[in-house]
Amino acid sequence: MRSRNPFFYERFGVPDTVDGRFDMILLHSFCVINALNKQGQGGRELAQALYDVMFVDMDRSVREMGVGDLSVGKHVRRMMKAFNGRMHAYQAGIDNASLDEALMRNLYGTVTGTVDPTNLTIMGDYIRNQVAALNTMNPDRLMQGDIEWAPVPGAGIKQRAPIVEPQKTDQAVA
């Protein structure tokens, strides 16, 4: 639930919209999946399971927003494509300035007007800090989903992620 923290929207100018919230979910998912992928085969399998559960939930969310059954698959595929593109952009930019460019294009892409460059820098640093923290945390805790996020800069917020058991579903994501 870290991505829903109002601080990102109120202080750092992330749009408090469906798109802004979607991008915050993708950013935090990137951080976790990036760390899991470094934990060998078991980590890669868990990363894939997280991806699968995430998009089953996206499917449910799209339906709850009133998208018709015939269009849901198309919407979810578009979201998956967006996620995959962002994963590559964030991975490529984690060690350089192209992360800020990717954040500007994606996280702040729907902002009308000027994006405060300080917010962009803070968000880039925030993501880099999360990746570093997750890459150095105890692998057993990471694999159990016992994630401790690095603090949000300037917010004094440090948060543990609740361990959530995935719901079983018969739905397949197209």
PLM features: what roles do these ranges have?
Residues 1-174:
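Surface/interface-facing alpha-helical segments and adjacent flexible terminal/loop regions used
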